[in-house]
Amino acid sequence: MKVVSNFIFTILLTLNLSAALEVVTSRIDRGGIQGFHGDVKVHSGATWAILGTTLCSFFGGLEVEKGASLFIKSDNGPVLALNVALSTLVRPVINNGVISLNSKSSTSFSNFDIGGSSFTNNGEIYLDSSGLVKSTAYLYAREWTNNGLIVAYQNQKAAGNIAFGTAYQTITNNGQICLRHQDFVPATKIKGTGCVTADEDTWIKLGNTILSVEPTHNFYLKDSKSSLIVHAVSSNQTFTVHGFGNGNKLGLTLPLTGNRDHFRFEYYPDTGILQLRADALPQYFKIGKGYDSKLFRIVNSRGLKNAVTYDGPVPNNEIPAVCLIPCTNGPSAPESESDLNTPTTSSIETSSYSSAATESSVVSESSSAVDSLTSSSLSSKSESSDVVSSTTNIESSSTAIETTMNSESSTDAGSSSISQSESSSTAITSSSETSSSESMSASSTTASNTSIETDSGIVSQSESSSNALSSTEQSITSSPGQSTIYVNSTVTSTITSCDENKCTEDVVTIFTTVPCSTDCVPTTGDIPMSTSYTQRTVTSTITNCDEVSCSQDVVTYTTNVPHTTVDATTTTTTSTGGDNSTGGNESGSNHGPGNGSTEGSGNGSGAGSNEGSQSGPNNGSGSGSEGGSNNGSGSDSGSNNGSGSGSNNGSGSGSTEGSEGGSGSNEGSQSGSGSQPGPNEGSEGGSGSNEGSNHGSNEGSGSGSGSGSNNGSGSGSQSGSGSGSQSGSESGSNSGSNEGSNPGAGNGSNEGSGQGSGNGSEAGSGQGSGPNNGSGSGHNDGSGSGSNQGSNPGAGSGSGSESGSKAGSHSGSNEGAKTDSIEGFHTESKPGFNTGAHTDATVTGNSVANPVTTSTESDTTISVTVSITSYMTGFDGKPKPFTTVDVIPVPHSMPSNTTDSSSSVPTIDTNENGSSIVTGGKSILFGLIVSMVVLFM
């Protein structure tokens, strides 16, 4: 029976064989089996549709010209699928138009097998199947080039395969390959500047030991369910990946593991490279800049703890235009002869697309896709990058030192318990500067994070990042403030690892530092500074368990720990420029250390608004009736001069001078030149407001009238109470001018109106009520309260905002620059922290090669020891504490005429909790300033 079936099949196939076929005009062929012998060519402008077929074979080459279309579709119901075979080893396959193979309506296995001596696509190819069962699609040739668009689509995810090229050869892709619901496992090398886009739960597995992918080629993870997996046992490569984020995955074919020198994964923010490691086998992914190291997480990919995901949106990085060519479903096949009259066009050829995706607003392009695809010049913008070393040397001459402390416990899956402490190299540089307006600062932040992943093991690790210490000479003049010193603290944690039979425990000791703040007292003297090194050894235990037993390895790390010694002195100076300037300066400096320029300018203006709003209404109500009774007649004159002249003069003069003092906050924020410009500008604002006072009072008393009462009460009350208090609260300069004029007019009119009407009725005719109601109150309020109050708040708030903003902004900018220079590790910075206090320190001295001790016969020697801890990113990409740096200041000589010798030498005691504190009479304050300068270094 089988022989008979094969014979019938051969007969039917022979009946459909023909010689070389030239399709010049559009046509539709129907039938279950189609066979074509010889070369087939579809000419431009023609559409050829083969419908209702289950088997279509070509025994020769195939060429589809630009503007031509070839459709092969199975529409015989859901059972019979489409099988297309084009197998020739001596003739090429060339497509410059549209080829569509469609078996989406069937529920059975479909197979697309197209190959030739060479394969070239400059147009569009669509390979569509149902995905209900395993389907395959192969486009193979020894010479394989795609400059156009290839879309491989399944209705749903099945265990189908798609492959391009010939095994262990090279394919060139300069166009777009879209994979939707597919598994793609290339067995070839890949070169070119094109893109492979993974969409709708597509899984891509790349490479082995002899295959490579050029860094210029792009992979685009378009949705949150797609994955890119790289063979772990392979030569080190850098893969260019776009769209990583929102939960999609990058991984290796082996579980991610670290060793004593490297972590399981590391992200380098300066280069945008993510490194994944299976012990000694790393692979690199160029994912772009802007990722947060805290949002990376290790996950499973098909049963292995071998991938990393990112729990955040994709940063706005540039995506090449070739990756943004739309992955469309393609044009529909003509169903009847009437459909052939409508020319079939490419879905991309007739559309103008914008290449800006959700991840990028950089690339924007509108073009005819076929024209651009047929040209081999279509390229993506990409950059190749060398592998970045995980050891980073950092040089900095900044005067700010920031130490970031992270304490993290991460519980991870697996059958082993790993405890590690690691540190990378430390670079120490020194520079010399002299400045009268810059400040030295040291800040410390502490973060705690815990991440837990359920499985059979527990992993705890503590690591440290690169630390940069800089010693700097400066001459600074400031007032006494606060300093932060640190005492050493030891934290011990237990690591538990369990399998099915037993649990083991390891004890890990972590050294940290605890900050404590004290007031500093100014002293005088020189500052000799030096940096020395000692060697610190840290030992950790690594426990590995399999199904039968557990083994332990002891790893010892040796690091060079810097010890910095200094003597420090401070001097104090007082700001000049009048009482008002002094008050403003104090207000600004007290709040400036909190949040830099923002807090400093905000509090300065607050003082101005309170004084202005309080004084305005009191003076206005007190003089309303008096001015009204003195001035007699003149209705228009009294009202206009009372509210207009008093208000305008107070506002003009006070506002102009007051705003000059207030504008100091902007200059401080940009240059950080100090607090002295604030007081000077503030005092000018004071003199300006006195002019407003004189003009207001003269105009008010010069003309007053009965009719003026109506105007005084109406407009005066609205502008006085409403605008005065509002403007005062905004800033120092606005407070001075607006409160002076507005409260005067407002309160004056209210009081004048109330009393004037009563007196007017007793006195008789129109002149009686007019004088009482009008100009007296308006003018007196404008001149008395408005101008006087305008001058004082103007000067005070002006200098306050100037001082606060400058001190805060200078510190903030230095902090940010310091932390950003650390490459490849996660740090956190909080610019402006405690900068107000640190601007009060004054440091002078010279760097020396060795620690220096100064003393005389009548002097007493003191010393203080301080510790600083550094950190490094962990195996899970998050920072951990590791190295403690002991900082030992050089002994400083105290004057021999110290009255209390018993308190001149500080000592270091130990509390019950194991931490150290500095004690010892008056000298403890000097010890604290020494510690502050050490931290600045």
UniProtKB/Swiss-Prot annotation:
Residues that span the membrane, as ranges: 42-62
Composition bias of kind Low complexity appears in 344-392, 415-475, 567-590, 666-682, 726-742, 802-814
Membrane topology, record value: Lipid-anchor; GPI-anchor
Q: What protein am I looking at?
A: Hyphally-regulated protein
Write out the biased-composition intervals (Polar residues). 393-414, 841-851
Biased composition annotated in UniProt, kind: Gly residues: 591-609, 619-631, 641-665, 699-725, 743-801
Q: Recite the UniProt keywords alphabetically.
A: Cell membrane, Cell wall, Glycoprotein, GPI-anchor, Lipoprotein, Membrane, Repeat, Secreted, Signal, Transmembrane, Transmembrane helix
Q: Which InterPro entries match?
A: Hyphal-reg_cell_wall_N (IPR021031)
Where would I find glycosylation on this chain? 16, 236, 449, 488, 580, 585, 595, 603, 619, 631, 641, 649, 711, 747, 759, 773, 897, 913
Residues annotated as region 7 X 4 AA repeats of N-E-G-S? 610-753
- Propeptide residue numbers? 914-937
Q: Under the cellular component aspect of Gene Ontology, which terms does the record hold? A: extracellular region; fungal-type cell wall; plasma membrane; side of membrane
Q: Where in the cell is it found?
A: Cell membrane; Secreted, Cell wall
Q: Which domain of life is it from?
A: Eukaryota
Major subcellular site: membrane
> Which residue ranges are recorded for the region named Disordered?
332-483, 567-857
What is the protein's species of origin?
Candida albicans (Yeast)
Q: Pfam families from the entry?
A: Hyphal_reg_CWP (PF11765)
What are the sequence repeat spans here?
610-613, 666-669, 680-683, 690-693, 698-701, 738-741, 750-753
This chain's function reads: Nonessential component of the hyphal cell wall.
Q: Where is the composition biased (Basic and acidic residues)?
A: 817-829
Which residues are covalently lipidated (GPI-anchor amidated asparagine)? N913
What switches on its expression? Induced specifically in response to hyphal development.
Signal peptide, first to last residue: 1-20
